[in-house]
């Protein structure tokens, strides 16, 4: 990876470098010295902005949350408008992400698995991220007592597809299975 442009402020260069490395290589596998080297900052500058690796990890997750949720909201809105319903919109929305050559699963699932014992805060951050993803999904579901539960069901299906694509290293099978499950849900929910 090339270092971020030097025109960016040091904190942003550090964060963007950490984002790319943490997402691609994992949080534990990425050392501070590598981030310092690839972001083109001095060690003193790094520690002025991020006194600990844990603080950088939390900043990475906050940044990733903002970026991913913004993309998800926009993409989902586009496909819901195109298809008129959330269920058929989810597959093409996720296909966009899964087809990205840099796809490496969900940064929140990955980080929670890597750091649950070492950084329990990562679990709280992951839970908040997943809750906000479910809330975004709920926006497109009919009002009613089942709305929240249905949003959670869809979020769980999405998480399963995310992990399946990450393990299989290709999205076609996961997207096919997700489409079948969503079609089944549409029939069940339509009968109620």
Give the ranges of each region predicted by the language model.
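Amphipathic alpha-helical packing segments from all-alpha helical-bundle domains
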Residues: 66-69, 75, 85-88, 117-142, ...
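Alpha-helical DNA-contacting segments of helix-turn-helix folds
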Residues: 57-64, 71
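Secondary-structure edge/capping motif, primarily at the C-terminal ends of alpha-helices
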Residues: 79, 115, 165-169
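Hydrophobic/aromatic-rich alpha-helical bundle segments in the mid-to-C-terminal region
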Residues: 121-128, 143-192
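N-terminal intrinsically disordered/low-complexity leader segments
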Residues: 1-9, 190-192
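Helix-turn-helix
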Residues: 13, 17, 21-55, 59
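Hydrophobic alpha-helical connector segments
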Residues: 59, 73-100, 151-154
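Amphipathic alpha-helical segments used for helix-helix packing
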Residues: 98-124
